[in-house]
């Protein structure tokens, strides 16, 4: 609705929500992981092919979509349509962690593939226990050597509070004369 109100300001937009407000259910911060869904740590966006290679095309597509979202949100902030972006987006490293030889081999191949793609070229990879302790101290606490483990990390990840973002976007829309938000519908 926000994008439509921008590109077609003469349209009248009715937005319906079953609940009593915006950002209460699926986008609420208690119900959404908030990783930004930029394909930095979500392993399911990189698929191992029958020949053992890694197909990263879905990861590239997802990352491009997320970057477009960030640009859109940045434009809304720049134009004063929404404020205080720190309330809905924070920088946060994205880490993938795996255990077992099959998973470690997959993560290593994923790393080798992603680091050749400009949008992922800052990815780091380790099988070193001490490095993993630095990257994720709570997760590695009391973990004993002897199990094959690996991790990858991209420092430029984000944490998105989709509940806060949704409420900000709804507040913006409530100020628009061509938009009608209908709650409890």
What is the meaning of each model-derived region?
Residues 16, 97-98, 155:
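Short hydrophobic segments within beta-strands
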Residues 27-31, 138-142:
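FAD-binding beta-loop-beta segment adjacent to the flavin cofactor pocket
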Residues 147-185:
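Helical element adjacent to the flavin cofactor pocket in flavoenzyme catalytic cores
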Residues 12-14, 140-146:
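Active-site-adjacent bridging/hinge elements
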Residues 1, 66-74, 166-170:
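Short, hydrophobic/amphipathic alpha-helical packing segments
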Residues 5-29:
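Glycine-rich FAD pyrophosphate-binding loop
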Residues 33-134:
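Dinucleotide-binding Rossmann-like beta1-alpha1 core, especially the glycine-rich loop
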Residues 1, 12, 22, 180-185:
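Short, intrinsically disordered, charge-balanced linker/junction segments flanking boundaries
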């Amino acid at each position: 609705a926000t994008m439509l109100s921008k590109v077609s300001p003469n349209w009248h937009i009715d937005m319906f929500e079953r609940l009593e407000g915006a950002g209460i259910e699926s986008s609420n911060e208690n119900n959404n992981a908030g990783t930004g869904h930029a394909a930095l740590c979500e392993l399911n966006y990189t698929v191992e092919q029958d020949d053992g290679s890694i197909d990263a095309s879905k990861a590239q597509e997802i990352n491009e979509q997320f970057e477009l979202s960030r640009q859109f949100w940045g434009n809304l902030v720049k134009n004063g349509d929404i404020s205080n972006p720190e309330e809905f987006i924070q920088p946060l490293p994205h880490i993938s962690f795996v255990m077992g030889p099959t998973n470690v081999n997959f993560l290593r191949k994923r790393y080798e593939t992603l680091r050749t793609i400009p949008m992922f070229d800052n990815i780091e990879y380790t099988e070193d226990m001490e490095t993993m302790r630095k990257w994720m101290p709570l997760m590695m606490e009391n973990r004993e050597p002897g199990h094959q483990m690996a991790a990858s990390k991209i420092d430029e990840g984000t944490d998105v509070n989709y509940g806060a973002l949704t409420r900000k976007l709804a507040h913006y829309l409530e100020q628009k004369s061509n938009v009608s938000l209908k709650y409890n519908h």
